[in-house]
Amino acid sequence: LSAGSINSPQLLQLSGVGPSGLLQSLGIDVVVDLPGVGENLQDHVMAGMSFSVKNDKDVPPQKVTGNKKTDSYVNSAVSYVAFHNIFNDADAFRGKIQARVKAIPDELNVDDSVREGYRAVYDKIANDLFYSNVSPVEILGNVMFGSISLQAALQHPLSRGNIRITSKNPFDYPRINPNYFREDIDLKILREAFKLIREITQQPPLKDHIASENWPGNGVQSNEQWEDWIRNAAGTEYHPSSTCAMLPRNKGGVVN
């Protein structure tokens, strides 16, 4: 059964496959008690900075600067930035991640099987991913008439949400809890990514074409100001996943 990361757990739960406590509370007969159905929701949370350009006339986006290489970047390029390029103290921050991921599973109100799956995945993230050249963030460029938008999207969040039905009616929307920024580490990674974006715009060739930073603006400088802005500006990149995890059932997955 595959209906996407939102509707797959919804249909399974409606069919009696999912966390028994949830199903029984809604009067649904339990066919298979599978606690991981609807858990482990992950998403690429993102936000974008906006800059006005010096040539703000009615110029098509593909010719905003007149330089093909520059225009190519700000219109269509996607950059994946390695962990050590985002954090000056990358080793120290990796240590914080390792310490944190050991504690997260025990803090979550989930079934023991789901907790074991979290432990396995978090261990992989902390010990492999953040020590490789795999990027924790994606940086995207986009040009509109008179402005440039540079966005950062978190690629490997530590925060986990869930999806749960609210009734037996298949036409009722499930409750989606993305749980963005439950883990402060996610917020800090995005914060440093946006600092990098600001730095990029202050270097050639972009600095020669940017007139001002419109959003969030130069008033945002401290770590606290960056984090407040991100909390208010961030949203989904529409990449939810993992609500029917391809893990063994004893680790909260749906694979027998």
Residue ranges and their predicted role:
Residues 185, 217-224:
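Short coil/turn linker and secondary-structure boundary residues
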Residues 1-51, 56, 148-205, 228-256:
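C-terminal structured subdomain/cap of oxidoreductase catalytic cores
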Residues 207-219:
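Short, glycine/acidic-rich hinge or "gate" loops at secondary-structure transitions
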Residues 145, 219-221, 250-252:
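Short, internal active-site loops enriched in acidic
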Residues 9-12, 16-144, 205, 221-225, ...:
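Mid-to-C-terminal "cap/lid" subdomains and adjacent gly/pro-rich loops that border
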Residues 214, 225-228:
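Residues in intrinsically disordered, low-complexity segments of regulatory proteins
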